[in-house]
Amino acid sequence: MSRPVPNPGILDIAPYTPGKSPVAQPGRKVFKLSANETPFGPSPHAIAAYQSAADHLEDYPEGTSRVLREAIGKTFGLDPDRIICGAGSDEILNLLAHTYLAPGDEAIATTYGFLVYPIATMANGAKLVIAEEKNLTCDVDAILAKVSPNTKLVWLANPNNPTGTYIPFDEVRRLRAGLPEHVVLVLDGAYADYVAKNDYETGIELVSTTENTVVCHTFSKIHGLAALRIGWMFGPANIVDAVNRIRGPFNTSVPAQLAAVAAIKDTAHVEMSRAHTIQWRDRLTEEFTKLGLTVTPSVCNFVLMHFPQTAGKTAAEADAFLTQRGLVLRGLNNYGLPHALRMTIGTDEANELVIAALREFMAQP
């Protein structure tokens, strides 16, 4: 009996594995610290805006997310006509791959880049080429060394998940200058809101002055709208025009659009979340280092800690130990980091519990 056969390369794609969801434990509070979600939830104004959409669920959305694009444009001083909104930035990444990659093409990503990059690349029949990182950080020279006549696109998460590292804007500018003009540079800024470094920029300047660079952002992280799937891209007119030709006409829902507009206007909520993250990022790094763990310097809303390979002290054993205590972190085997755990910065209570639990774990004989 014959059956449908997927396109070449589809079955070579490793399915994306999200962070573990917590399993209820009788008599114990469970904290999900595995998916880099905000511990504060969305702005109350975003919740109210979302609820207001219930009165007209029979109506299709405005097909271009115009009101949201205008709100984003006003917030960041951008031309709304050069903004595309999507069902999460994941959809936009896939749209970019579908627009610019075909069988025989190559896209470049770094060793520990976001796992959606290989999916988007290979789903379009293209080959993903890996540029080695240096100290868990993007290496511009390594990327440029991988460029070939078949290179059509470069994926760069800056800052990066799951490492939490970033490269200064001067390095991003050097990367763009070193790439052929026909290569699209995709700057994924999902975690940009958490960066507090003077030498960091999202890349909007490059987008404004080139025809081959885009910046992607999400409302899933600091704005707390992960459940609604809403993100956006700022790009040159030529790329926006091309992507819009394959974008679904009603790809973002009315509730998501309204909530995102309210979220982006509530700057106090954003600043509160950012301040909490920065304070705890420093504290957790210090505490985990005291325990003998190696912590990769992070500019995001999570920390990456590396465990010994000694029996009784491994990342897998620490993960099990924490899970038993209602603390759900992210193991990173699928990223090629089997000896590390990634912890989302949670509430004060959750963070203190992780510190105490790891102190107990590392003190075991």
Swiss-Prot record:
Needed co-factor(s): pyridoxal 5'-phosphate
Annotated positions of the N6-(pyridoxal phosphate)lysine modification: K221
Chemical reaction(s) catalysed: L-histidinol phosphate + 2-oxoglutarate = 3-(imidazol-4-yl)-2-oxopropyl phosphate + L-glutamate
UniProtKB keywords: Amino-acid biosynthesis, Aminotransferase, Histidine biosynthesis, Pyridoxal phosphate, Transferase
Transmembrane portions of the chain: none
InterPro entries per the UniProt record, alphabetical: Aminotransferase_I/II_large, HisP_aminotrans, HistidinolP_aminotransfase, PyrdxlP-dep_Trfase, PyrdxlP-dep_Trfase_major, PyrdxlP-dep_Trfase_small
Stretches the record annotates as Disordered: 1-22
GO BP, sorted A to Z: L-histidine biosynthetic process
Keyword Transferase: yes
CDD domains: AAT_like
GO molecular function, one term: pyridoxal phosphate binding
Pfam families (UniProt xref): Aminotran_1_2
EC code: 2.6.1.9
Pathway this chain belongs to: Amino-acid biosynthesis; L-histidine biosynthesis; L-histidine from 5-phospho-alpha-D-ribose 1-diphosphate: step 7/9
Record family assignment: Belongs to the class-II pyridoxal-phosphate-dependent aminotransferase family. Histidinol-phosphate aminotransferase subfamily.
Subunit structure as annotated in this protein's UniProt entry: Homodimer.
HAMAP family in UniProt: HisC_aminotrans_2
Official protein name in the record: Histidinol-phosphate aminotransferase
Organism of origin: Rhodopseudomonas palustris (strain BisA53)
